Amino acid sequence: MNAVLSVQGASAPVKKKSFFSKFTRLNMLRLARAVIPAAVLMMFFPQLAMAAGSSGQDLMASGNTTVKATFGKDSSVVKWVVLAEVLVGAVMYMMTKNVKFLAGFAIISVFIAVGMAVVGL
């Protein structure tokens, strides 16, 4: 038994929708219609929006000393992370000869320092 396969019509590539096609004027108006009432309610009732009460209890307060000891400025974890960044940056530079990888550890170290300061460690 012989089966013959045939294609009906001309095969044309299917045009994919662009990522930016989602950002149409109509979609932006729909988004604004959904967001503006919520923003107005949060503006008039900030206590409900933030769910902050004066009688709240910090359940994670007992772990602050442990976190500061593990991830603080003088901890060994931060030193090992920086050392790993330097080694990975050096190896990636040797493999690709791209200076971005070599200087990347300095940029990541700055981000870590700023992040630690923001968090309070």
Curated annotation (Swiss-Prot):
Loss of function: phenotype: Loss of sensitivity to toxin CdiA-CT.
Residues recorded as bearing N-acetylalanine in the entry: A52
InterPro entries: TraA
GO cellular component terms, semicolon-separated: extracellular region; plasma membrane
UniProt similarity note: Belongs to the TraA family.
Topological domains, Cytoplasmic: 97-100
Provenance organism: Escherichia coli (strain K12)
Quaternary organization: Monomer. Interacts with itself to form filaments; also interacts with TraQ.
Protein name, UniProt field: Pilin
Propeptide: 1-51
Pfam families: TraA
Effect after changing Y93D: Production of small amounts of propilin and pilin
Result when mutating G9S: No production of pili
This protein's UniProt keywords: Acetylation, Cell inner membrane, Cell membrane, Conjugation, Membrane, Plasmid, Secreted, Transmembrane, Transmembrane helix
Role noted for this protein: Propilin is the precursor of the pilus subunit, pilin, that forms conjugative pili, the filamentous surface appendages required for cell-to-cell contact during the earlier stages of bacterial conjugation, and that retract after contact is established. Mature pilin is assembled with the help of TraQ and TraX. Functions as a receptor for CdiA-CT from E.cloacae and E.coli, although it is not clear if this is physiologically relevant.
